[in-house]
Amino acid sequence: LLIVMLLLSCLAGTLLISTNQNRNLVNQYVSETVELYVSQFQKEMDVMRVELINILESNEATNELPDYFNSESSQVFPILKKISEQLRIQAIWHDSVYGYYEYIGTSNALITSTGTKFSKSVKTSTERFLMVYLSANMTRRQNSLYHEFVKIEDQMYLLTWYMKGQKIAGNLIPLQRIFEDLENCTKGYTILPYIYD
């Protein structure tokens, strides 16, 4: 009976040590996975920054837009449609992005992947927020990139935008999506005991 008790206590000790070892390995793996995700997200943000700058600096369609146009300026409709399509494609490349947009301050026009909105257009709450917010920020420093946290209808976003002249290019990233991705990095790892020598 004493030998059985000793064997059971040795086995329990071995299981406890192996569980702790396994837990340490899982924690290390989760930590490294999260670090990798953050590193990838940072690289994606760097790519998006370059894309926003290129939209205003070297995009032919954006450069073809006149300084002022309105909802009755039919000559710019093909250009606006081309820009909308380019913004739609930009959003497809980045899973985390809610959407790309361009804002033309002189015309108070917001170009998104779904079309162009003017001051009297019917807009979603997000489009309405962007038009008001960006219009109010047109006096900020030119040729600059901005990152700001904004709240739109009970949801927090990372609003990134680049301004040149009276034009702004930017995107919205829901913070909830970032947090969900981080949380998913830590799920699915169970701790199974193994015999440790």
Describe every region a protein language model picked out.
Residues 6-14, 117-118, 125, 142-158:
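An N-terminal domain-start capping segment
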Residues 89-91, 136-138, 159, 182-184:
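Short, flexible, glycine/charge-rich loop motifs used to bind or transfer phosphoryl groups or to couple energy/partner
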Residues 94-95, 186-189:
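A structural signal for short coil/turn segments at secondary-structure junctions
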Residues 112, 120-131, 151-186:
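Conserved beta-strands of PAS-like sensory domains
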Residues 28-40, 44-133:
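Extracytoplasmic/periplasmic sensory segments of membrane signal-transduction proteins
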Residues 132-164, 190-197:
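Membrane-proximal, non-catalytic sensory/regulatory domains of signal-transducing membrane proteins
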Residues 1-24, 28:
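Extreme N-terminal signal-anchor transmembrane helix of membrane signaling/transducer proteins, especially
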